[in-house]
Amino acid sequence: MTDPTTPSAWGIQLSKLWMATGQPFPVDVKQLALEVTKTRFPDPIGIVTPHGIPGIDGMLSKRKTKGDWCISYDETVTVPGRINFTLGHEFGHYLVHRQTRKEFRCGQSDLLDYNSVASMKMESEANRFASFLLMPANDFRKQIERQVISIDLLGHCAERYGTSFTATALKWLEITAEAAILIVARDDFVCWSYPSKLASRKAAYLPPGTPVPRSAIDRLGGAAQHSRNECRRVGPGVWHSTMEAEEAAI
């Protein structure tokens, strides 16, 4: 079997391998990493284990005594699916980047910082590998075809793939033909945003530090009065200068 040359190609190949064995989702990254690397590489991943280091979601490090590699992760993370994506991320570093250094330390800001100028190319590539491995596009499309996208539908996909809601929403944005944008905010200001391809062409992007529209803040403040799946149509000037939008918030 020829080794792929890009993160997405690696993810696609190993995702197909997982599905070909008849195994269900979510992909067991630990099992796959251990089995694949020991049969294909002289310096395999020898162990996947918790590390107990606060603030470090995941690490990939070479073990000097054994000459193999270790993936370790923060077992105290409570966000559903985040550990699984972290393992996929570190597996991506192994496949694509292990020739460049002997240790990778990754925190949550590295895993999600898609639009920061300071975000390293390698982190983006590791994220891309994990996305293609854990959430194959063809299967994802089957889960959402002929359905209206909603918070609960994306939540179903997140549960199926063992990924966080955020990672799942980002995957949908990568494959959708709709103009859509994910916005993550804290304390009434945008932390980061990620647009779909069509939304990007329409200049639908909010940079970090942008104030969240007052109407959205008021809506979240009254969260008990609306359903998670309730979409509200808002006019131009709220999320885009000239376009209306359908807004869903959690």
What label would you give each PLM region?
Residues 1-250:
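Active-site hotspot residues in diverse enzymes, especially metal/ion-binding acidic/histidine motifs
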